[in-house]
């Protein structure tokens, strides 16, 4: 064990290298806030939603692949924003990323869409044909009995 490792200086050097690779202290704090981890890896590819997929085999197997969602999503990310081909790569179902080896396309497969029920303005609300049984009282109005 070297003196550098014993004093922990190698950890400080590794952290400094990560800060440099990520793009500065501000970028590290932003990534730490969004992902709860400060990871550095090679960009494997991106999809049509703007997600960026990374891999670093220095981490152990379930955590060596990850996705970074675009800034427009911020903290409102959802698992449905990851297309199926990238999902299979993230979960080690396939070894090759879709950017390297695209999966075969079928005529009957629809294009992937994210779940829109998380957005209030795009949420599906069925039309109701029944009257409400309970009506809220508004001050200053006479009650209406049918």
Swiss-Prot record:
Complex and partners: Complex I is composed of 45 different subunits.
InterPro entries: NDUFA12 (IPR007763)
GO terms under cellular component: mitochondrial inner membrane; mitochondrion; respiratory chain complex I
Main location as per UniProt: mitochondrion
Membrane recorded as keyword: yes
Family, similarity comment: Belongs to the complex I NDUFA12 subunit family.
Compartments it resides in: Mitochondrion inner membrane
UniProt keyword rRNA-binding present: no
Membrane topology: Peripheral membrane protein
Function, as annotated: Accessory subunit of the mitochondrial membrane respiratory chain NADH dehydrogenase (Complex I), that is believed not to be involved in catalysis. Complex I functions in the transfer of electrons from NADH to the respiratory chain. The immediate electron acceptor for the enzyme is believed to be ubiquinone.
Protein name as catalogued: Probable NADH dehydrogenase [ubiquinone] 1 alpha subcomplex subunit 12
UniProt cross-references to Pfam families, sorted A to Z: NDUFA12
Keyword terms, alphabetized: Electron transport, Membrane, Mitochondrion, Mitochondrion inner membrane, Respiratory chain, Transport
């Amino acid at each position: 064990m070297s003196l550098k490792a014993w004093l922990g200086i190698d950890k400080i050097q590794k952290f400094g290298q990560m800060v440099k690779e990520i793009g500065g202290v501000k970028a590290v704090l932003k990534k730490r806030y969004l992902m709860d981890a400060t990871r550095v890896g090679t960009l494997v590819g991106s999809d049509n939603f703007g997600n960026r997929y990374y891999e670093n085999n220095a981490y152990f197997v379930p955590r060596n692949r990850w996705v970074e969602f675009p800034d427009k999503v911020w903290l409102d990310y959802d698992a449905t924003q990851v297309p199926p081909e990238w999902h299979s790569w993230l979960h080690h179902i396939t070894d090759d990323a879709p950017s390297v080896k695209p999966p075969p396309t079928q005529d009957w497969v629809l294009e992937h869409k994210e779940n829109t029920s998380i957005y209030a303005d795009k949420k599906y609300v069925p039309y109701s044909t029944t009257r409400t049984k309970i009506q809220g009282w508004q001050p200053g109005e006479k009650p209406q009995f049918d």
